[in-house]
């Protein structure tokens, strides 16, 4: 590890500890040249697929963009920040576990809607109206009809 003080490449690890609920390892190091101490952190690299947009563009998976969309859909609804974070965690985990290099934005949108459908129907309809780009009230009513039909015993 390169010393942040003198740039020397050799050091020794003095102490290692797990941190952040076991997701991070904190290491105290001492430079072999200047003998100053510094701290480094190690974590598993998240390998998330690239998102392929409807127009063919490719973007890195952006968890914050996902959370923003969920917050907008859930605005003024009885949905907690923890519930929004749990949905984002689940979708991110599903994307990681798919082990695919690319994922379609439409697939992510469908996953969001599946989670919102069970959490809050109003948030679901809000998200669907933007995601599916309803052009008129008839398309909106068709989606509401599907929701009502799925809810009926």
From Swiss-Prot:
The keyword Ubl conjugation does not apply. Pfam families: ATP-cone, Zn_ribbon_NrdR. The keyword RNA-binding does not apply. Keywords: ATP-binding, DNA-binding, Metal-binding, Nucleotide-binding, Repressor, Transcription, Transcription regulation, Zinc, Zinc-finger. A zinc finger (unnamed) spans 3-34. It comes from the Bacteria. One of its GO terms (biological process) is negative regulation of DNA-templated transcription. GO terms for molecular function: ATP binding; DNA binding; zinc ion binding. Its cofactor is Zn(2+). InterPro entries: ATP-cone_dom, NrdR-like_N, RNR_NrdR-like. Residues 49-139 form the ATP-cone domain. Binds 1 zinc ion. Belongs to the NrdR family. Negatively regulates transcription of bacterial ribonucleotide reductase nrd genes and operons by binding to NrdR-boxes. HAMAP family: NrdR. This is Transcriptional repressor NrdR.
